[in-house]
């Protein structure tokens, strides 16, 4: 099953996540099909907290990709920010 989920990056105590489309059997930070955005939970000042390619996210959801709970909330927040 194809899923949209977060892959962790960044350094210790300073997380950074990529929104990735991947097979659900792959490791969290392993192989992915496509990166469709990023999420920086510790963004400060002028840093961008969330960036999502809405067109690609919509495409993958239409193809049957299942978002994780956190990604579903982030996609909702991104749509609200763009509206």
UniProtKB/Swiss-Prot annotation:
Belongs to the bacterial ribosomal protein bS16 family. It comes from Pseudomonas aeruginosa (strain UCBPP-PA14). Keywords: Ribonucleoprotein, Ribosomal protein. This is Small ribosomal subunit protein bS16. It holds the Pfam family Ribosomal_S16. The keyword Ribonucleoprotein applies. GO terms for molecular function: structural constituent of ribosome. One of its GO terms (cellular component) is small ribosomal subunit. SUPFAM superfamilies: Ribosomal protein S16 (SSF54565). One of its GO terms (biological process) is translation.
